[in-house]
């Protein structure tokens, strides 16, 4: 009976030791791709806001020279955010295969940091551009859903 209990405890210990509490590389990769999908929708808004701001700038409806400079700077920031996303997508390796799980995890964690920084930049520039558009009584664009996008 004593051997049976020891064997049962040993099996239970092995079972719990095999369970991971940290996400694996595939889970981190999936989260990176989910953020990418959200940023694709947000990127549409970045581009449309930039086009609207550019139209205001070219229309001559700018309230002052200071506003004109601020709007030009904001358009530049929107362009940079969009370019940063395009660069990240160009260099991102969806099918990355390292020598081991740790390399895979390190790669996808590094990509998570990069894509989160882009997300922060998108949030900042869309917030500011939405505010400027409201000042000119122009409705900002709502993001659309990517229902058919698959990885």
What is the role of each PLM region?
Residues 1-23:
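Sec-dependent bacterial lipoprotein signal peptides
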Residues 44-51, 55, 83-97, 120-134, ...:
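Charged/polar positions within long, soluble alpha-helices
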Residues 19-66:
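Immediate post-signal-peptide N-terminus of mature secreted/exported proteins
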Residues 71-119:
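Long, amphipathic, charge-rich alpha-helical segments that form helical bundles/coiled-coils
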